[in-house]
Amino acid sequence: ASTVEALGKSIVAGQYPVGTSLPPEPQLCENFGVSRTVVRESIKSLVAKGLIVTGPKLGTRVLSEDQWNWFDPDVVSWLSQKRLSADFLRDLQELRRIVEPAAIRLAAERATTRELTSIEVAFSGMKNAVENGGDYVTHDLRFHQGLLQASGNRMLVQMSKVLGALLRTSFEISTAKKNGPAESLSMHREVLDAVIAREPDRAEAAILHLIDGAKQDIDLVLSSRRRIPYIGRPATPLRAL
């Protein structure tokens, strides 16, 4: 693991409590066997991610979770390896309910032929993974990111990139439900068909149905386990039916 990854994971895991200082630079160099330059660059990266703050009188102090950059893929990945909280998943589902329906309405009005083809390819990948085994989650992510990109709104297109890690986190858990991917295929098809038909109202209703179904799957997965699943590694590929 890189120095920034090792430090980031340690902070997210609570090894350095909020308000405490990281070890001094020479100690970090010794701990990780790296140069001062590497340590300084790692510190800069963690500052950019909102995990720590530095200053002449402050030193290098750990910030509270509300200061972290929740859209940073590394931060999300480190959080998932720590085991996610129920609050995190609630916030994520609420964010999806706010962003995706509005984006889908725009996609139904603006999607180009090329964008629709890209989403269709992603759906085919999902279907193939269900029927023949394979990486369902990656195709699922491409499907949803494709819909955001098809909105024709540059800010939503940018958001599709930063939402990637968050969406993957949601999909990793919801697809852990037995037969979950197979059951959701028809809902994904309904979303895509509504967008292709240029029917914003129908598309919005379909994506809400899909998001709420994913929430039920997540709740079911969580209720059957004492702790939220560990998803530090990619989801296990599906087996053929």
What are the functions of these language-model segments?
Residues S2, R40, Y136-D140, A176-G180, ...:
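Juxtamembrane/interface motifs at transmembrane-helix termini
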Residues A1-I98, R105, R225-I228, G232, ...:
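Short linear motifs at protein or domain termini
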Residues P17-G19, L106-R114, P200, L222-R225:
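Surface-exposed helix-capping loop/turn segments at secondary-structure junctions
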Residues L92-I173, S184-D193, R202-D217:
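Conserved amphipathic alpha-helical segments that form helical-bundle/coiled-coil interaction surfaces
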Residues D201-L241:
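C-terminal effector-binding regulatory domain of bacterial HTH transcription factors
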